Amino acid sequence: MGAFTGKTVLILGGSRGIGAAIVRRFVTDGANVRFTYAGSKDAAKRLAQETGATAVFTDSADRDAVIDVVRKSGALDILVVNAGIGVFGEALELNADDIDRLFKINIHAPYHASVEAARQMPEGGRILIIGSVNGDRMPVAGMAAYAASKSALQGMARGLARDFGPRGITINVVQPGPIDTDANPANGPMRDMLHSLMAIKRHGQPEEVAGMVAWLAGPEASFVTGAMHTIDGAFGA
């Protein structure tokens, strides 16, 4: 019997990288898992076949679609919001429409998903939002909008923790540093610069982030809410 046997889990953004590792972790631990995808249909199909989880197409930039997928998931025990994008470049040169889409996916979707989930969660429900260490530290130029979107999650989680606490629901933010995914590979061009800023000079693995998520979703973290949990090899220290 797994740690999450009988639990219902929805993961927004679960087809690749950190999201896929979280899907695998909860399935391995016995949960009934649904996950969303947008641009990675083939990866989502493979993951669903591998794990038995259910894949659901959802554009996280569409507020109504986000609310709908949460609502149709029923009385969730655990919500994980991992969907996110990056828009990078000098602020004076970026397209305003791209920035609006970034904020819709990285800020609006986590907010609306969390609120809708809390409406139907039982006492003891868990909400985990995947943020970024860049919400605390931005050592390079060209990432202001991305950093702003991740910093916003901190205030959101602290405020929603106050609103959800009387319902017995916790909400926390997991803030990864450099993690070995296709978006930021361990052998990529940024490796040496990133590792020079870290005490543990390697990229983290998606499974390490999934492990932190699983702990925060479990019974030992029932008194933990409104907090930021950084997993970054001291990138932000």
Curated annotation (Swiss-Prot):
Signal peptide: none annotated. NAD(+) binds at residues 10-34. The active site is at residue 146. Keywords: c-di-GMP. InterPro entries: NAD(P)-bd_dom_sf, Sc_DH/Rdtase_CS, SDR_fam. Coiled coil: none annotated. Disruption phenotype: Mutant shows decreased biofilm dispersal. Deletion increases the cyclic-di GMP concentration in the cell. GO terms for biological process: single-species biofilm formation. Induction: Expression is time dependent in biofilms and is controlled by BdcR. GO terms for molecular function: cyclic-di-GMP binding; NADPH binding; oxidoreductase activity; protein homodimerization activity. Substrate binds at residue 132. Belongs to the short-chain dehydrogenases/reductases (SDR) family. Increases biofilm dispersal. Acts by binding directly to the signaling molecule cyclic-di-GMP, which decreases the intracellular concentration of cyclic-di-GMP and leads to biofilm dispersal. Also controls other biofilm-related phenotypes such as cell motility, cell size, cell aggregation and production of extracellular DNA and extracellular polysaccharides (EPS). Does not act as a phosphodiesterase. This is Cyclic-di-GMP-binding biofilm dispersal mediator protein.
